[in-house]
């Protein structure tokens, strides 16, 4: 079968114990881009998940309306602001090991323009979620700008908006795998169970 299951033994192979004399600089530098007026919880929860996942340093780019909310939710994170109620420009002026974009970012005209401009110059693989995917579903001409090796994390409805519906869940898995290959991305299907289509290893993993 082309499908494998993820269990505790699988995860143990990736687990790395932290060295006693290490520091935050040894564990990566991440940037999260998202949030808008009324949707700051999404980027806040995503930032918490990023820190929980083990990143050493994390910055967030958010609109200024959410600064106080975000810093109260995630005091461990550093914070950059752009725009008042929505992000209007996305500029990355330093090196990051990982960049995530989309949670709560909105699909406003200014944000769509900001994402399109960012994708035209970005060469680094991205983790794209939520409204970043909703923007791509409306502006499919942007799909060819997605950096190779990026990660999409759609739930079922976000996936349907991007790639169309499937008759059943098995066909959706096959379709998601084909789209991952076509776009040179890694496709992480959210739901009660998760399906991961990894481009580099050409494998499909099911998390039960």
Predicted segments, located by residue:
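Small-residue (G/A/S/T)-rich helix-start motifs and N-terminal tracts that mark the onset
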Residues: 1-126, 134-151, 156-208
């Amino acid at each position: 079968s082309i499908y494998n299951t993820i269990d505790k033994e699988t995860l143990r192979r990736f687990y790395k114990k932290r060295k006693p004399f290490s520091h935050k600089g040894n564990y990566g530098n991440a940037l999260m881009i998202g949030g808008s007026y009324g949707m700051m919880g999404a980027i806040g929860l995503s930032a918490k998940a990023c820190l929980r996942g083990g990143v050493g340093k994390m910055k967030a780019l958010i609109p200024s309306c959410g600064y106080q909310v975000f810093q109260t939710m995630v005091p461990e994170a550093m914070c950059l602001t752009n725009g008042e109620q929505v992000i209007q420009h996305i500029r990355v002026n330093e090196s990051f090991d990982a960049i995530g974009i989309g949670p709560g970012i909105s699909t406003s005209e200014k944000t769509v323009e900001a994402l399109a401009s960012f994708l035209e110059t970005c060469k680094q693989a991205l983790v794209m979620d939520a409204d970043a995917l909703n923007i791509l579903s409306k502006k499919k001409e942007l799909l060819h700008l997605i950096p190779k090796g990026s990660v999409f994390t759609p739930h079922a409805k976000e996936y349907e908006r991007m790639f169309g519906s499937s008759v059943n869940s098995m066909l959706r898995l096959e379709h998601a795998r084909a789209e991952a290959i076509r776009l040179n991305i890694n496709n992480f299907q959210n739901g009660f169970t998760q399906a991961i289509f990894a481009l580099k290893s050409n494998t499909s993993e099911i998390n039960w």
